[in-house]
Regions:
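Canonical Radical SAM [4Fe-4S] cluster-binding loop centered on the CxxxCxxC motif
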Residues: 1-40
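Residues at the starts of beta-strands that form the adenosine-phosphate
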Residues: 21, 55, 89, 157-159
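Extended, folded domain segments that form the structural surfaces/walls around functional sites
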Residues: 22, 97-113, 128-147, 152-154, ...
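Core AdoMet radical
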Residues: 26-41, 45, 49-70, 82-100, ...
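Acidic (Asp/Glu)-rich catalytic clusters
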Residues: 45-51, 78-85, 105-116, 148-155, ...
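Distinct, well-ordered alpha-helical segments
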Residues: 68-76, 100-111, 172
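Surface-exposed, active-site-proximal loop segments in enzymatic domains
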Residues: 129-135, 172-173, 204-210
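Conserved C-terminal portion of the radical SAM core fold
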Residues: 142-204
Length: 210
């Protein structure tokens, strides 16, 4: 199966701008695109890969549903672009706090019903201590549960990302918290879970500590 990850430039994650990024994140910041500019980029750079594609993941430097990164007009451009192609699976990557009925309804109205739509959300761990003190991750687990339910209300699939190898923990605790987090996500109704091994990337706080 062919897979394409399309990362759209943006001003960056709202949490990184306001209170510091997750300890392992190297997404950085860019600039927001004008709708006409985005349309041109999609047509010139992405369309060549669309025919015969099985899965496309649409993301940004932060959250695709965050209108401080991707304006409503730009989001419409993305949906109009995707609607031109018969792609079996479309994935939108976003923070759970940005999941709302307006965005999900737009997707349902634009994307063909036969297309499987997945909303992918990074939550990393169900352990509040790990989130706050090991990762500097700003997320409400209650908000994540509500997002999963809302996604299902619009007949879409919810995917959560779990981190394996949280810093400042011994190996046993790293494994235990990852297993607990996978199980917790499924208990809340997640349709799938992606486990990401910790990647020590340059220009991150984790890299400096390492």
């Amino acid at each position: 199966d062919t897979f394409l990850h399309c990362c759209i430039e943006s001003r960056g994650c709202q949490f990184s701008r306001k209170c510091g990024s997750c300890i392992m994140c190297d997404y950085g910041e860019g600039r927001n695109l004008h709708p006409d500019e985005l349309r041109k980029e999609l047509d010139e750079r992405v369309s060549q890969y669309m025919n015969g594609l099985h899965t496309i993941l649409i993301g940004t430097y932060g959250s695709i549903f965050d209108e401080d990164e991707i304006s409503s007009a730009c989001f419409d451009v993305i949906l109009e672009f995707l609607a031109q192609y018969s792609i079996p699976t479309v994935i939108f990557e976003t923070h759970c706090s940005t999941v709302n009925s307006n965005k999900l309804k737009k997707i349902r109205d634009k994307i063909p019903r036969k297309t499987k739509v997945i909303i992918e959300m990074g939550y990393e761990s169900c352990d509040a201590y790990v989130l706050k003190y090991c990762l500097n991750k700003f997320i409400s687990l209650e908000q994540l549960k509500n997002a999963i339910k809302l996604i299902h209300d619009y007949r879409m699939s919810a995917c959560t990302n779990v981190l394996l190898g949280a810093p400042f923990l011994c190996e046993r605790d790293q494994l235990d918290t990852a297993v607990k987090s996978v199980n917790w996500a499924f208990e809340q109704g997640a349709d799938s879970v992606v486990v990401f091994p910790m990647n020590i990337k340059p220009f991150t706080l984790l890299y400096k500590l390492y």
